[in-house]
Curated annotation (Swiss-Prot):
<dbReference type="GO" id="GO:0019843">
    <property type="term" value="F:rRNA binding"/>
</dbReference>
<dbReference type="InterPro" id="IPR001196">
    <property type="entry name" value="Ribosomal_uL15_CS"/>
</dbReference>
<dbReference type="InterPro" id="IPR005749">
    <property type="entry name" value="Ribosomal_uL15_bac-type"/>
</dbReference>
<comment type="function">
    <text>Binds to the 23S rRNA.</text>
</comment>
<dbReference type="InterPro" id="IPR021131">
    <property type="entry name" value="Ribosomal_uL15/eL18"/>
</dbReference>
<feature type="region of interest" description="Disordered">
    <location>
        <begin position="1"/>
        <end position="58"/>
    </location>
</feature>
<feature type="compositionally biased region" description="Basic residues">
    <location>
        <begin position="13"/>
        <end position="24"/>
    </location>
</feature>
<dbReference type="InterPro" id="IPR036227">
    <property type="entry name" value="Ribosomal_uL15/eL18_sf"/>
</dbReference>
<comment type="similarity">
    <text>Belongs to the universal ribosomal protein uL15 family.</text>
</comment>
<dbReference type="GO" id="GO:0022625">
    <property type="term" value="C:cytosolic large ribosomal subunit"/>
</dbReference>
<feature type="compositionally biased region" description="Gly residues">
    <location>
        <begin position="26"/>
        <end position="38"/>
    </location>
</feature>
<keyword id="KW-0699">rRNA-binding</keyword>
<dbReference type="GO" id="GO:0003735">
    <property type="term" value="F:structural constituent of ribosome"/>
</dbReference>
<keyword id="KW-0689">Ribosomal protein</keyword>
<comment type="subunit">
    <text>Part of the 50S ribosomal subunit.</text>
</comment>
<protein>
    <recommendedName>
        <fullName>Large ribosomal subunit protein uL15</fullName>
    </recommendedName>
</protein>
<dbReference type="Pfam" id="PF00828">
    <property type="entry name" value="Ribosomal_L27A"/>
</dbReference>
Amino acid sequence: MTSISLDSLKPNKGARKRKTRKGRGIAAGQGASCGFGMRGQKSRSGRPTRPGFEGGQMPLYRRVPKLKHFPLVNSKSFTLINVASLNSLKEGSTVNLDSLVKTGIVTSPKYPLKVLGNGNLKVKLVVQAAAFTASAKTKIEGAGGSCEVFE
């Protein structure tokens, strides 16, 4: 067995393939048309065409309109309720998603509760929700109630 040294290292058989020299005569194997076929744009000099080029036809990426306002990827969804719909509840009661379902104000409690500030509140309530708008928070606290944020 021979010892391995840096000067004795060789690549495996067939690992280093020789580059084909195109257009160097028929005997070289890639002479004449160099493997590009007979005629056409792909056989001419200056090839290949750029990606997306459709031969002068208006390309797809220019035919399609530039659409704006794509939906957010990780958008949060909420069960929305306005402050005005809380007026029918008892004074001093605690309001959360479960209590709103029991009273029938919310019919499909699929997502966490978010309170919006449309309308006026005349009842003092303790509201527990995942999120509040700024106007909803001021109206609830203005009526003497409190806002508790939780997930």
